[in-house]
A protein has these predicted regions:
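Nucleotide-activated chemistry modules centered on ATP-dependent adenylation/adenylyltransferase
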Residues: 1-176
Length: 176
């Protein structure tokens, strides 16, 4: 099974910069771009996504946590959580509107997910508990944390690792 390479566009500067960086640095890498639409994005966010689509020459998939509802996804889940707003202690917004739609989008395919978190940011970022998703943080000085390395090197991940190493070897042999 072919490894999918995906990159999420949040609407912020870091994910946009990462998309541009990856296109310039790895022009032959077939990256799928996606965004998780909460229904509460600013018009400027949608404009950024459109501008990136034009620059990248690819459609950015719009993932919505609630497909068959007259409400936008945020309002839908706000009602489900009894009007309780998300916070750093209750991250239902991140889980329901971003992580779950992303994991549904990639399914069980082997995936390398590129995440635009800088090395100076004091947060881990998304590291999936699903064995088929490997998160990589190209803007970090230390790209992989210890738990990611341990996860990546498990025997159950051998086929995914073999495919990644083959793709790196092909790139190295072609002089990139």
């Amino acid at each position: 099974m072919k490894t999918r390479h995906v990159l999420g566009i949040s609407g912020g500067k870091d994910s946009a910069a990462l998309a541009i960086y990856m296109k310039k640095r790895y022009p032959t890498l077939d990256i799928e771009y996606y965004t998780c639409d909460t229904g509460k994005e600013l018009d400027e966010t949608y404009q950024l996504i459109e501008n990136l689509e034009n620059y990248l020459g690819k459609t950015i998939q719009k993932l919505r946590a609630v497909e068959n509802s007259h409400e936008d996804p945020f309002d839908h889940f706000l009602k489900r959580y009894g009007g309780f707003l998300p916070s750093s202690g209750s991250r239902w917004c991140t889980k329901k509107l971003k992580l779950e739609p992303f994991e549904q989008y990639v399914g069980s395919d082997p995936v390398v997910s590129y995440v635009g978190i800088r090395g100076n940011e004091d947060r881990e970022g998304y590291i999936s508990k699903k064995s088929n998703i490997q998160s990589i943080f190209p803007f970090r000085k230390n790209i992989w944390s210890e738990d990611v390395v341990q996860k990546a090197l498990t025997n159950s991940n051998r086929d995914v690792l073999t495919e990644i190493y083959r793709s790196i070897d092909v790139e190295a042999r072609s002089g990139r």
